[in-house]
């Protein structure tokens, strides 16, 4: 009975800040690696919501029916002590300014 609710995909947002120990020339590769990791775990594309100019701080949206704790645990393994991340479930889009790609992703999921 309740299992159909558990299988409904939910939308999530992850904010990731790579530590100062990551050399600037490796930031892009690390961000892409983390995006690919999340994409493989959730079995769908991950939408980059924003990236700081140096790519040390990024935000991404993803959708999954998987237990979010599985994704959290894998992301924890893939990051270092100096990295930081926050993941949360996303509700309805309340509005946006200048974030059309991210807003469009939210509106269509």
Q: Where are each of the predicted segments found?
A:
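Short S/T/G/P-rich N-terminal loop/turn motif that feeds into the first structured element of a domain
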Residues: 2-34
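A hydrophobic alpha-helical transmembrane-helix feature that marks the membrane cores
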Residues: 25-27, 31-41, 51-52, 97
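Short, aromatic/basic amphipathic alpha-helical patches
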Residues: 33-34, 73-77, 101-105
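Short, intrinsically disordered low-complexity segments
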Residues: 39-82
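A short, structured active-site edge motif that brings together acidic residues
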Residues: 83-94
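Short, low-order "capping/linker" segments at domain edges
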Residues: 94-109
């Amino acid at each position: 009975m309740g299992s159909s609710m558990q299988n409904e995909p939910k939308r999530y947002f992850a904010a990731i800040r790579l530590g100062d120990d990551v050399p600037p020339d490796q930031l892009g590769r690390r961000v892409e690696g983390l995006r690919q990791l999340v994409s493989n775990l959730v079995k769908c594309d991950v939408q980059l919501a924003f990236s700081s100019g140096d790519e040390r701080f990024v935000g991404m949206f993803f959708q999954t029916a998987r237990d979010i704790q599985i994704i959290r645990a894998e992301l924890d393994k893939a990051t270092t002590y100096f990295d930081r991340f926050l993941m949360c479930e996303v509700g309805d889009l309340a509005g946006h300014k200048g974030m059309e790609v991210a807003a469009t992703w939210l509106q269509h999921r």
